[in-house]
């Protein structure tokens, strides 16, 4: 097998260590209408497009109960739209703050370029959010050839394979088994599996880990190992083909997969 294309997620995978920007925006948007939501309630559905994610949060029994207690009615579609609009405004204003490439990404970009492996992205961001992130990434040397949002796939996002399939098509890769999908959430892994791609989960700085770099580095070695084991188990349950501690391990994995098969003469 040879990997011809690598498709990355954005927040928590290539930028924004710990996938903090969406968490902060979700919490602020709900707090603005008097509803408190936990990180765990948000993170369980990370990887979905943000509009769908708002609906998922609204459907949580605890949120429905809090909403009814506060407003005497259940949340409506208009309520979802209002919160999404507020969420988007908050996120757009904060994306530049969280746009730094994660450790190891610069070396990965150099490796992919040197080995003529094309790369692109799929994302839960919409086009407007992506338009803010792309130039920030480009200034750091990260310029994916294609960037797919669910707006380009008729609103069908993860865990369905549509965005990944479109990314591969635009990169002119016809065999999905030669595509590697790298992400930091369960929905990223499911997207890869559903597309028949090679799915890879990143541990450190992931959505599943849920810690900023500062917070993670403040943990004891034993606590770090425990957190990493928790993330590893989540990826294993989702069916990840490979699990990497950090992006720095990706070049070695690609070398391993892409090494020529020895033949007898």
UniProtKB/Swiss-Prot annotation:
GO biological process: DNA repair; organic phosphonate catabolic process
Superkingdom of origin organism: Bacteria
Cofactor binding remark: Binds 1 Mg(2+) ion per subunit.
Binding site for Mg(2+): 9, 11, 184
Single Gene Ontology MF annotation: phosphonoacetaldehyde hydrolase activity
Primary enzyme class: hydrolase
Signal peptide limits: none
Keyword Magnesium: yes
GO cellular component: cytosol
Stored Gene3D superfamilies: HAD superfamily/HAD-like, Putative phosphatase, domain 2
Keyword annotations from UniProtKB, A to Z: Hydrolase, Magnesium, Metal-binding, Schiff base
Matches recorded under SUPFAM superfamilies: HAD-like (SSF56784)
Pfam families: Hydrolase (PF00702)
Cofactor(s) this protein requires: Mg(2+)
EC assignment: 3.11.1.1
Keyword Hydrolase in annotation: yes
InterPro entries membership: HAD-like_hydrolase_sf, HAD-like_sf, HAD_sf, PGP-like_dom2, Phosphonoacetald_hydro
Catalyzed reactions per annotation: phosphonoacetaldehyde + H2O = acetaldehyde + phosphate + H(+)
Catalytic residues in the record: 9, 50
Subunit and partners: Homodimer.
Described purpose of this protein according to its UniProt entry: Involved in phosphonate degradation.
Membership in a protein family: Belongs to the HAD-like hydrolase superfamily. PhnX family.
Protein's name according to its UniProt entry: Phosphonoacetaldehyde hydrolase
Higher taxonomy: Bacteria, Bacillati, Bacillota, Bacilli, Lactobacillales
